[in-house]
Amino acid sequence: TNPPTGWGSLTDSKWRGKIAFADPAVSGSSYTILCTMLQALTGDNASILTEFAENLDGKPLSGSGDVVRAVGEGRKYIGVTLEETALKGIAAGYDIEIVYPEEGTSALPDGAAIVSGCAHRENAELFIDFLLSSDVQTLLHDSLYRRSICESGANAGTDELKLIDYDLEW
């Protein structure tokens, strides 16, 4: 059987019981993944969610790390999780590969901010500069498998990915 190529494939009944996915009620990443799926696909959202849920056989996993383990240990064929989680699994020795959905995926930023009127603004600005430095961005990539936000950073950007216009207010 050909592996799935996109979000739409995950609603095909041939994958019933073969998909690992963390419970979106307790996993923020799984919630974001579901929102991405629904925004990338056209059709009735209730039907898409129902078909996907049926393919999970009523057994969502307790966390994102469980998704990679289920696939890496051969208990499931497909794992739907974040890129960084999959990369950590590959680094840990699991024989898995990443497939990016043909319909597109999301790339959401993490944030760092300075509180308005804070007592030590100069130190806060220095800390933000430190976080955005090439050294820290390289460390985040090499150790935590996060994409760099710096064009000069390791694995910079998302140019090779097909990204959807993710609606944060959706």
Question: How would you name each of these model-derived features?
Answer:
Residues 149-170:
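An extracytoplasmic/periplasmic, membrane-proximal ligand-sensing/linker region
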Residues 1-75:
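Extracytoplasmic ligand-binding site segments that recognize negatively charged/polar headgroups
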Residues 77-95, 144:
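A ligand-binding cleft/hinge motif common to bilobed small-molecule-binding domains
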Residues 1, 38, 108-121, 139-140:
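A bilobed periplasmic-binding-protein/Venus flytrap-type ligand-binding module shared by bacterial periplasmic
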Residues 17-26, 49-53, 60-61, 92-118, 130-153, 160-162:
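Periplasmic-binding protein-like
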Residues 67-68, 86, 124, 136:
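Short, hydrophobic alpha-helical packing/hinge segments within bilobed ligand-binding/sensory domains
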Residues 18-22, 78-81, 97-100:
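Structural recognition of the beta-strand scaffold that forms the well-ordered cores
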